[in-house]
Amino acid sequence: EEERAGYRKYAALHKQWRDVIHHGVQWRMDMPDATTLAHGVVSPDKAQAIFLVSQLAMPDYTLMAPLRLAGLEASARYQVTLLDHPNIQITGEGGHTMRKLPAWMTTPQTVSGEWLQQAGLALPILDPESAILIGLQRV
Protein backbone atom coordinates (compact mmCIF):
# COMPACT_ATOMS: atom_id res chain seq x y z
CA GLU A 1 0.00 0.00 0.00
CA GLU A 2 2.90 2.34 0.72
CA GLU A 3 4.21 1.82 -2.82
CA ARG A 4 0.80 2.67 -4.30
CA ALA A 5 0.63 5.82 -2.21
CA GLY A 6 4.01 6.81 -3.62
CA TYR A 7 2.78 6.30 -7.20
CA ARG A 8 -0.33 8.39 -6.47
CA LYS A 9 1.78 11.14 -4.93
CA TYR A 10 4.09 11.41 -7.94
CA ALA A 11 1.25 11.12 -10.45
CA ALA A 12 -0.48 14.06 -8.73
CA LEU A 13 2.78 16.02 -8.65
CA HIS A 14 3.30 15.42 -12.37
CA LYS A 15 -0.26 16.55 -13.15
CA GLN A 16 0.28 19.72 -11.12
CA TRP A 17 3.51 20.58 -12.99
CA ARG A 18 2.80 18.97 -16.38
CA ASP A 19 2.47 22.22 -18.39
CA VAL A 20 5.73 23.59 -16.99
CA ILE A 21 7.60 20.31 -17.52
CA HIS A 22 6.42 19.81 -21.11
CA HIS A 23 6.31 23.41 -22.37
CA GLY A 24 8.90 25.25 -20.29
CA VAL A 25 12.50 26.19 -20.92
CA GLN A 26 15.07 23.77 -19.50
CA TRP A 27 18.03 25.04 -17.49
CA ARG A 28 21.11 23.29 -16.12
CA MET A 29 22.97 24.97 -13.29
CA ASP A 30 26.74 24.71 -12.93
CA MET A 31 27.61 23.39 -9.49
CA PRO A 32 31.18 23.60 -8.17
CA ASP A 33 30.98 20.06 -6.79
CA ALA A 34 30.75 17.41 -9.50
CA THR A 35 28.80 15.16 -7.14
CA THR A 36 25.81 17.55 -7.25
CA LEU A 37 23.58 18.01 -10.30
CA ALA A 38 20.95 20.74 -10.59
CA HIS A 39 18.51 21.36 -13.39
CA GLY A 40 15.06 22.81 -13.82
CA VAL A 41 12.28 23.93 -16.09
CA VAL A 42 10.86 27.47 -16.14
CA SER A 43 7.46 28.20 -17.70
CA PRO A 44 7.54 30.37 -20.86
CA ASP A 45 5.95 33.29 -18.97
CA LYS A 46 8.40 32.80 -16.06
CA ALA A 47 5.51 32.48 -13.60
CA GLN A 48 6.40 28.96 -12.43
CA ALA A 49 9.50 26.84 -12.20
CA ILE A 50 10.50 23.44 -10.89
CA PHE A 51 14.09 22.49 -10.03
CA LEU A 52 15.70 19.18 -9.07
CA VAL A 53 18.92 18.98 -7.06
CA SER A 54 20.49 15.50 -7.07
CA GLN A 55 23.32 14.36 -4.83
CA LEU A 56 25.13 11.59 -6.71
CA ALA A 57 27.81 10.72 -4.15
CA MET A 58 29.31 12.12 -0.97
CA PRO A 59 30.05 15.81 -1.58
CA ASP A 60 33.68 16.82 -1.93
CA TYR A 61 33.19 19.86 0.32
CA THR A 62 31.82 20.30 3.83
CA LEU A 63 29.49 23.12 2.81
CA MET A 64 27.18 22.99 -0.18
CA ALA A 65 27.40 25.85 -2.66
CA PRO A 66 24.20 27.91 -2.98
CA LEU A 67 21.82 26.98 -5.78
CA ARG A 68 21.64 29.98 -8.11
CA LEU A 69 18.50 29.55 -10.20
CA ALA A 70 18.47 30.51 -13.86
CA GLY A 71 15.67 31.66 -16.15
CA LEU A 72 13.60 33.64 -13.67
CA GLU A 73 12.33 37.20 -14.01
CA ALA A 74 14.66 39.34 -11.89
CA SER A 75 12.00 41.90 -10.89
CA ALA A 76 9.38 39.29 -9.93
CA ARG A 77 8.83 37.78 -6.49
CA TYR A 78 8.61 34.02 -6.15
CA GLN A 79 7.34 31.74 -3.43
CA VAL A 80 9.85 28.94 -2.94
CA THR A 81 8.41 25.62 -1.76
CA LEU A 82 10.02 22.25 -1.06
CA LEU A 83 7.92 19.82 -3.13
CA ASP A 84 9.70 16.58 -2.31
CA HIS A 85 12.66 15.42 -0.29
CA PRO A 86 14.37 12.25 0.90
CA ASN A 87 13.75 11.03 4.41
CA ILE A 88 15.56 13.83 6.21
CA GLN A 89 14.12 15.44 9.29
CA ILE A 90 12.11 18.48 8.27
CA THR A 91 11.66 19.63 11.84
CA GLY A 92 14.42 22.18 12.20
CA GLU A 93 16.86 19.47 13.31
CA GLY A 94 19.11 18.90 10.34
CA GLY A 95 19.37 15.13 10.51
CA HIS A 96 22.76 13.53 10.90
CA THR A 97 24.73 16.04 8.83
CA MET A 98 23.32 19.41 9.90
CA ARG A 99 22.01 21.03 13.03
CA LYS A 100 19.50 23.15 11.17
CA LEU A 101 17.87 23.00 7.75
CA PRO A 102 17.65 26.08 5.50
CA ALA A 103 14.50 28.03 6.40
CA TRP A 104 12.93 27.61 2.94
CA MET A 105 12.83 23.84 3.49
CA THR A 106 10.49 24.08 6.47
CA THR A 107 8.42 27.15 5.55
CA PRO A 108 7.72 28.49 2.05
CA GLN A 109 9.69 31.72 1.50
CA THR A 110 9.00 34.63 -0.86
CA VAL A 111 12.07 36.21 -2.49
CA SER A 112 12.93 38.14 -5.64
CA GLY A 113 14.00 36.48 -8.86
CA GLU A 114 17.16 38.58 -8.74
CA TRP A 115 18.01 37.23 -5.28
CA LEU A 116 17.43 33.65 -6.44
CA GLN A 117 19.71 34.22 -9.43
CA GLN A 118 22.50 36.12 -7.62
CA ALA A 119 22.57 34.85 -4.02
CA GLY A 120 20.70 31.59 -4.51
CA LEU A 121 19.18 29.10 -2.11
CA ALA A 122 21.18 27.55 0.68
CA LEU A 123 21.23 23.80 0.11
CA PRO A 124 21.18 21.05 2.71
CA ILE A 125 23.84 18.38 2.72
CA LEU A 126 22.06 15.42 1.14
CA ASP A 127 22.91 11.77 1.42
CA PRO A 128 24.39 10.16 -1.70
CA GLU A 129 21.85 9.03 -4.29
CA SER A 130 19.12 11.36 -3.05
CA ALA A 131 17.42 14.49 -4.37
CA ILE A 132 15.15 17.38 -3.51
CA LEU A 133 12.47 18.92 -5.71
CA ILE A 134 11.84 22.67 -5.46
CA GLY A 135 8.81 24.56 -6.80
CA LEU A 136 8.61 28.29 -7.51
CA GLN A 137 5.45 30.31 -8.10
CA ARG A 138 5.42 34.02 -8.99
CA VAL A 139 3.36 35.99 -6.46
Q: At which residue positions do the language-model features occur?
A:
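Aromatic/acidic polysaccharide-binding cleft in carbohydrate-active enzymes
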Residues: 1-14, 26
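A broad, low-specificity signal for short, low-complexity segments enriched in glycine/proline
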Residues: 9-16, 40-42, 95-98
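Feature captures the RNA virus RNA-dependent RNA polymerase
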Residues: 10, 29-30, 39, 112
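Alpha-helix capping/termination and helix-coil
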Residues: 11-22, 76
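Short coil/turn segments at secondary-structure boundaries
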Residues: 21-31
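Carbohydrate-binding surface patches
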Residues: 31-74
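C-terminal beta-sandwich/jelly-roll accessory domains of carbohydrate-active enzymes
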Residues: 57-139
